[in-house]
From Swiss-Prot:
PROSITE patterns: CHALCONE_SYNTH. Disulfide bonds: none annotated. It comes from Pinus strobus. The primary product of this enzyme is 4,2',4',6'-tetrahydroxychalcone (also termed naringenin-chalcone or chalcone) which can under specific conditions spontaneously isomerize into naringenin. It catalyses: (E)-4-coumaroyl-CoA + 3 malonyl-CoA + 3 H(+) = 2',4,4',6'-tetrahydroxychalcone + 3 CO2 + 4 CoA. Pathway: Secondary metabolite biosynthesis; flavonoid biosynthesis. Belongs to the thiolase-like superfamily. Chalcone/stilbene synthases family. The keyword Transferase applies. The active site is at 169. Its EC number is 2.3.1.74. Pfam families: Chal_sti_synt_C, Chal_sti_synt_N. This is Chalcone synthase.
Length: 395
């Protein structure tokens, strides 16, 4: 190839890349209207699943709910919907068709609601969105939820779409990692990132032989969160709330089968080992060292924290292992308390909670007054996603 053409190609490639790091420009949220009080949920759950005769199991489930750290959750499944779909209420009854009929409609609809709010906050015309990343663990369909939401929002047909199915609870970090690469390698790109999760795929009646399923029934909630990600924000027009500096993904050693899920005739079943909190807490410091040694940080209390709230035991053990100030996981525990575990969407709810509380409390940055922070996603594998974030000064 002639030297002049090589030089032109190099200049072309360089011109395609952004100058600065990817930033989060807006965040939008959506939940189903049906709010569930955790304190009364055991009575409701055992009644709606025709399991009130299982009194000992009900008391065990009540203890799970009491220890969950959750006050309320939001669920698409109302009493009326469940009464119309008794197969969903049974334990391991063939019910995939009924579940799919719900989620293939509701997942993109809820995602669209969150996306519309993010676009409104961003303040730019939706025609400027160049890429869409849609993530859900709730059902599978073709064309996917990415396509359905694109149509619902009225985005350009040429928008470049990425669909992620069946990633689970670590995927709130995954979508940020992919969005960062897209934004930084495509000058002017504006990436709409949506995580939408509906527990209609996992809801089922109790069983004393499958207690890990009951743990999920005590923890999981529904919600969608959307973000606009882009590099080189337009001054005075776009207002970033966080920058993304570095990302990683790893599979923890000796963790095969620690968390897994399987889509079957009965819906999505999931299994988790008791030692999931131990596996995460034992290995998390290695991920922190890998992420922050390049920034000269080794005191984990210098960071602001956004950790997927898989459950209170994970948070407690991470806190103890790293000697974290209890305030570090305040935003994480707050979201767990108000929404439950919403799988991939959770960490984005925590990002929103942190920036809003930082503003309300008069902090100097969106990261509770700190400059650098970490976002962790934990999920099937056992897989850990790590995102290093930089906060933005608050005026």
């Amino acid at each position: 190839m002639p030297g002049g053409m090589m030089a032109d190609l190099e200049a072309f490639r360089k011109a395609q890349r952004a100058d600065g790091p990817a930033t989060i420009l807006a965040i939008g949220t959506a939940t189903p209207p049906n709010a569930v009080d955790q304190s009364t949920y055991p009575d409701y759950y055992f009644k709606i699943t025709n399991s009130e005769h299982m009194t000992e199991l009900k008391e065990k489930f009540r203890r799970m709910c009491d220890k969950s750290g959750i006050k309320k959750r939001y669920m698409y499944l109302t009493e009326e919907i469940l009464n119309e779909n008794p197969s969903v209420c049974a334990y391991m009854a063939p019910s995939l068709d009924a579940r799919q009929d719900m989620v293939v409609v509701e997942v993109p609809r809820l995602g669209k609601e969150a996306a519309a709010k993010a676009i409104k906050e961003w303040g730019q015309p939706k025609s400027k969105i160049t890429h869409v990343i849609f993530c859900t663990t709730s059902g599978v369909d073709m064309p996917g939820a990415d396509y359905q939401m694109t149509k619902l929002l009225g985005l350009r047909p040429s928008v470049k779409r990425v669909m992620m199915y069946q990633q689970g609870c670590f995927a709130g970090g995954t979508v940020l990692r992919v969005a960062k690469d897209l934004a930084e390698n495509n000058r002017g790109a504006r990436v709409l990132v949506v995580c939408s999760e509906i527990t209609a795929v996992t809801f089922r009646g109790p069983s004393d032989t499958h207690l890990d399923s009951m743990v999920g029934q005590a923890l999981f909630g529904d919600g969608a969160r959307a973000l606009i990600v882009g590099a080189d924000p337009v001054p005075e027009v776009e207002k970033p709330c966080f920058e993304m500096l570095w990302t990683a993904q790893t599979i923890l050693p000796d963790s095969d089968g620690a968390i897994d899920g399987h889509l079957r005739e009965v819906g999505l079943t999931f299994h988790l080992l008791k030692d999931v909190p131990g596996l995460i807490s034992k290995n998390i410091e290695k991920s922190l060292v890998e992420a922050f040694q390049q920034f000269g940080i080794s005191d984990w209390n210098q960071l602001f924290w956004i950790a997927h709230p898989g459950g209170p035991a994970i948070l407690d053990q991470v806190e103890a292992k790293l000697n974290l100030d209890p305030k570090k996981l305040r935003a994480t525990r707050q979201v767990l308390s108000e929404y439950g575990n919403m799988s991939s969407a959770c960490v984005h709810f925590i990002l929103d909670e942190m920036r809003k509380s930082s503003q309300q409390n008069g902090c100097s940055t969106t990261g509770e007054g700190l400059d650098v922070g970490v976002l962790f996603g934990f999920g099937p594998g056992l897989t850990v996603e790590t995102v290093v974030l930089k906060s933005v000064p608050l005026q």
